């Protein structure tokens, strides 16, 4: 009997040990904890690590001092290799290739205030160490040893709260230095309200991409409220300090508030912004952070981030791969940004205050030339409601500004890239299920701005539209980027056609599908490349495949693959599959990071080459794409230098996400994916229809890049293309991977992704 009891005991114990984690065992971290906001803050990427809610208007992030008009640290405000912080900004733009935002800078300090911060980014800088710095979604903390103060921040959509733990008995202060926006300011005001322990103000700034702050300016307003009374206060006007002065205005202003000795008595600061008024900023703050509960706010935003990040989860892979993946998803939940206040008001492209429709949000900050290729698909997949509002927001911008914006920041069109990328962005989101917007009005606006030259708020629009319609291409002697602009416009036309088709406008669909084939007009049979062409019909000469004349951020060989809607025609024009395969072999024999517009190789660091890794699927050699995509994935990692180029508001990160799940949206405006095989054992996606799509992979590790078989809901899949409508209702997509190519799978006569004529 005793032996029987002992036997039963050991059986029960062994079962418990098999199902309960050992205290020392390593457990997979949550999707929230896997995010590392420092990824992409190094040499390339241009990301920032600060505290922000999903798509939040406000982002509290550190800014590094820089002494040039533009350097690598000035773009997002932060560069991981820098050792000093000169303040915390309230607005930032992630991944962009030019310096932007970093508005309404402030810094907690101690000691004397004997230097003016006006126009001096070094005046109150402090050293910092990454050993005493933490960043998680919605949270940022860092110690500033020069002032013996520990800072931490967390954020809601329009507001944020910070806590400053002073460890010195010296007088504690908070310095406001708005002239340290990325491009300075054109005007501004600061007001100190001692009775309510509040500082308010506004600045006018702008000048994206090396421009003056007076060029295409926007206004941003703020309110900052403290939980400690002011022992002193004052302002600066230029280099002159004015103690006990409460108000200051101009383009050379700063202010301070003091708290006396606050050693071991933390000071809290609540802040909010608005693009409408100080009063609206105050309403935003009162609505979102009514008390001083830092931990409560942090818990709320953590829950919100967890909700978004749980919409696409992965299992398997290495810890570094999971961190890279979830951070890439995180990067695609930062922009575009909520632009309306809690009362629904927002500043329109006509510089008038408008009211967003109940239940909707107005969004701003669209890096469309970058994001239409990848982020548009991912955001519509993860956040269809928000994506619908983004489409409606762009329509509002067009109605108020006269035409769709192409590359906008806040309520200003900067137009820094070629093409008219609003259209493929909208068409991609629609194709992926973001459909709660005014389709007919959007279609009508697209037709309007693509047949008559109209500007958005006085800028950009469909550049060279008359020439494009007359010649069927953009002459390089009329615009220096004529070749790449023509290719982009073909993608734009194809995207407009898809919206026209969805809206039931068949004649317009046919018209734009015809225009979408204009790439043929710049194809040079001699070089078998898309070559810049002049008004007289002659091709640009001299010409080489790596010359950049006629192309925006690239060259002829890099743009050769830029007809995603009709790759069959490109293959035919160039002489057939064998020639294109040999060209692609040479092109992808090296992968370039960083800046490489004059190189003959696959430039992973910039958007026009994103889709070229998947072209083998059109050539009947899908195993070559499968291996190449794994090489692409290996160019990313979970370090600050982990991105191979500018993240461009999430575009680069979205390339990683789709490559890692083995499904890439290769055709702008079409809902579907070309297939390359997942990196992870299991991927789970919550679709916009409330269903769950599960992707599984046997033998998924990096050493097994090749697809052996694919089944969806237990039925064989033999094509390298899967339409989204087959997946969006959920199901199980099973892959079997291997370390040797299967030269039969995906090679059938109908196995390639579609081309549209």
Segments the model singles out, each with a brief description of its role:
Residues 1-28:
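Bacterial Sec-dependent N-terminal signal peptides
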